[in-house]
């Protein structure tokens, strides 16, 4: 069986899938670097929707700190988003 066959076997699978995707795109969370200078906002589909950078990090001499803060905030946001995506998927599956 492939994915399409499985979806045909589940009543309202398309409706459930569409609802899940809508919720994953709509719901957002944020993560901030330890130094508090970068905040990443991400939806549950793991798409970055906003990035807030403290102006002090835009100084060219702070490029290393900016990079480290971006990586930290983005990785934390992705990790949190992944967990929320799994929770939402589990919730949708229980509706079947």
Give the ranges of each region predicted by the language model.
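Residue-level signal for functionally critical sites in structured catalytic/ligand-binding pockets
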Residues: 11-15, 19, 31, 44-45, ...
